[in-house]
UniProtKB/Swiss-Prot annotation:
The modification N6-(pyridoxal phosphate)lysine is found at residue 260. Belongs to the beta-eliminating lyase family. GO terms for biological process: tyrosine metabolic process. Signal peptide: none annotated. Homotetramer. Pfam families: Beta_elim_lyase. This is Tyrosine phenol-lyase. Transmembrane segments: none annotated. It comes from Clostridium tetani (strain Massachusetts / E88). It is an enzyme of class 4 (lyase). Keywords: Lyase, Pyridoxal phosphate.
Amino acid sequence: MDLSKYPAEPFKIKSVEPVKMISREEREIAMKEAGYNTFNLRSEDVYIDLLTDSGTNAMSDAQWAGMMIGDEAYAGSKNWLFLESTIKELFGFKHVVPTHQGRGAENLLSSIAIKPGQYVAGNMYFTTTRYHQEKNGGIFVDIIRDEAHDASIDIPFKGNIDVNKLEKLIEEKGAENIAYVCLAVTVNLAGGQPVSMANMRAVRELTAKHGIKVFYDATRCVENAYFIKEQEEGYADVSIKDIVHEMFSYSDGATMSGKKDGIVNIGGFLAINDEELFGKAKEIVVVYEGMPSYGGMTGRDMQAIAIGFREAMQYEYIEHRIRQVRYLGDRLKEAGVPIVEPVGGHAVFLDARRFCPHLDQEQFPAQSLAASLYIDSGVRSMERGIVSAGRDVNTGENHKPKLETVRLTIPRRVYTYKHMDVVAESVIHLYKHKEDIRPLKFTYEPAQLRFFTAKFDYAD
């Protein structure tokens, strides 16, 4: 292994959790009982869990030490003051509202910033984000660059907004009818693709001319900053911390799930500069999350997430993080497995369209591929395609995204390169026998965010 290309873990392992591989017969039974939905599996039946990087991270000794000084006062916790000051320092925002996770922040922002019938422009949808926008009367418009919808195109900063699309939307709908621009850094469903600093700057310049606010989905902003440092001219010698600070200088606020780049198990926030919107958010957070000084988090969790934000911006940490994901992607590409290119920040996305060419999108190829991967090796992954996209709120028809993928999401500081080898070998084996992957049909379809709890069975 080339250690300059794939650096060793920049940490020592102090505590371990045993895992076991149950038999193939047991995995087949578990998958059937789960309705061929990996979300419904019991974690004890999973060998390597790549369902998500959200809240599945390993905390550091410093974070665990911080947990011991949790101030669990109902109001005015010292841990909240530490978290608030950390967010203001690192991200540069004037005001912060804590939430139990990113979804809580999405709910707050959508509630205070969208009027029914207004448009929300963004660089590709995300499941829960679009749900909250539509729930509050918003209409999502995808303005990501066209290349992001093609898994095979390998170009940098594939998550960029197409500024011409944004300008056209403003001309057609009117600036007053656009609630805000939602800029995700990175873009999850495009494959964890980053946004360039130049693009953030261009979006800011255009929206400022029209008085339109820009809010970031900051969930994996540190990963985005690494790509800027690695690939964008003028940033090679700039620290991750300074890159992050500049990124958010081109925004009016951000929602964030701290369960990713905060390297913790729970927590999030809404950060905002506008005084009036901040006041509204503080009123609503009491209803949905808790007091504005904890937002659904314990004091110990707030201490841990503040420490985690600082650790995430250490170069050695984020370099290993990105390179470990890239290692898995490189192994699959070398074997000819079709994936979303380039490899993004938090996951490797299998291109289920090319992986399962014998299945129509309405036969749920990504869902079936994820189920097959678990049966083959005990590796849990996540469908990110037509099932996740859901149905059109007006027509009831399935949204049909151009990308039909299976996400292999790498938790932070949890698995080693050897685990990545196990995953790669299983995926490669499946690809050699891809014709055995069978079509699925719904047996239970929830009305909202169906991918979480839906159940399926084989359709043939």
